[in-house]
């Protein structure tokens, strides 16, 4: 089903957490519809769950049509089949167990620092942003003496309210750090992802390895940081769900899946390009046309989820698309789940009286960014 006139994207969320109202309406009226990109190019917008799942699992649509980060070298992308295969081989069960323990330590140290600093505190600045960057440092094998520098540049590059000059400077510094890290791993390999990639394929160039490391940082830092902060915000705004989770910690895994479904922090994406003439549930798409999938709208589809707009930490019906679907599903999804589970569990245990330190309406939200989140989240305990 299509609309006669193209629609443009909206990014203003409903009630802090829901997808834009226009997306919800489109899902009901035209789950596959014509749209127009900012540069005027026509394309397609998918808002229905079944249509989204169909596109993401259809080999006629390629992820290589995605617009790459302008600062990322083209030596490697997370959509290259060879690159994805090599990286996937490094996300082993053993490595995830190791990273669980390290994540617990990182989370504990940051909660200690927050508690020492005293109430109130900004949960974004002091917890949600730094924890994922240090977990990625562990994943890549950044030596302990270099982690403070790595953390500093990561937060300058990925933080909020930074000038263009500061972001550029941090990016250049991060690039240099990653290139030096690759050279170190060639001569002094360790039990980390970069060393594993070098052992798995010695033909990988230094440029490819540094590019992979940067892309993992891009993919794994902001999304996880915003999910942690918004997850805490969502629970604090739904005291019945917070009480249920506190009463039964065994609900943590289902709660994490529900937060992922309900929040879907990526505004619009993933993006696919048609390799050939194809169709999406009967809607014809010409070769070369670009398709954008609204994961947030798809994850609220009443045709797939019962009471889709309700937050329910006991929900057993998962199947959400927060990490995408099919051959290009997020490679780091298990690590992201570990971080969310560990971070939220420890946060709620440490601060049993955690609450917002300002009215919810005063929390600055990132409606205009590709990844939705809070610039700040003042909390008290």
From Swiss-Prot:
Its cofactor is heme. The gene is cyp105C1. Its EC number is 1.14.-.-. The lineage of its organism: Bacteria, Bacillati, Actinomycetota, Actinomycetes, Kitasatosporales. This is Cytochrome P450 105C1. Belongs to the cytochrome P450 family. Its main location: cytoplasm. Heme binds at residue 330. One of its GO terms (molecular function) is iron ion binding.
């Amino acid at each position: 089903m299509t609309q006669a006139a193209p629609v443009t994207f909206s990014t203003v969320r409903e009630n802090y957490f829901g997808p834009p109202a226009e997306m919800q309406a489109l899902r009901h009226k035209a789950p596959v519809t014509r749209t127009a990109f900012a540069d005027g190019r026509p394309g397609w917008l998918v808002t229905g769950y079944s249509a989204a799942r169909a596109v993401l699992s259809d080999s006629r649509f390629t992820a290589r049509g995605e617009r790459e980060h302008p600062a990322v070298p083209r030596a490697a992308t997370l959509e290259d089949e060879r690159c994805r295969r090599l990286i996937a081989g490094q996300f082993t069960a053993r490595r995830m167990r190791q990273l669980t323990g390290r994540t617990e330590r990182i989370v504990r140290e940051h909660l200690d620092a927050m508690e020492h600093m005293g109430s109130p505190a900004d949960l974004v600045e002091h917890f949600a942003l730094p924890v994922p960057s240090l977990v990625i440092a562990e994943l890549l094998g950044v030596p302990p003496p270099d982690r403070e520098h790595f953390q500093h540049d990561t937060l300058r590059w990925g933080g909020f309210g930074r000038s263009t000059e500061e972001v550029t400077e941090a990016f250049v510094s991060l690039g240099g750090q990653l290139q030096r890290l690759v050279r170190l791993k060639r001569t002094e390999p360790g039990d980390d992802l970069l060393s594993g990639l070098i052992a798995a394929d010695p033909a990988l160039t230094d440029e490819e390895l540094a590019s992979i490391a940067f892309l993992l940082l891009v993919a794994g830092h902001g999304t996880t940081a915003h999910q942690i902060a918004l997850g805490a915000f969502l629970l604090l705004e739904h005291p019945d769900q917070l009480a249920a989770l506190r009463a039964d910690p065994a609900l943590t895994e289902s709660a994490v899946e529900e937060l992922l479904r309900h929040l879907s922090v990526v505004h619009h994406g993933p993006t696919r390009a048609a390799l050939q003439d194809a169709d999406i549930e009967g809607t014809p798409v010409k070769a070369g046309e670009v398709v954008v999938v609204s994961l947030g709208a798809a994850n609220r589809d009443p045709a797939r989820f019962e009471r889709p707009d309700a937050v329910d930490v006991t929900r057993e019906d998962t199947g959400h698309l927060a990490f995408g679907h099919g051959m290009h599903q997020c490679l780091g999804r298990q690590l992201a789940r570990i971080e969310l589970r560990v971070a939220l569990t420890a946060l709620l245990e440490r601060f049993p009286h955690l609450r917002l330190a300002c009215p919810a309406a005063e929390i600055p939200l990132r409606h205009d960014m590709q990844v939705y989140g809070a610039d700040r989240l003042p909390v008290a305990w």
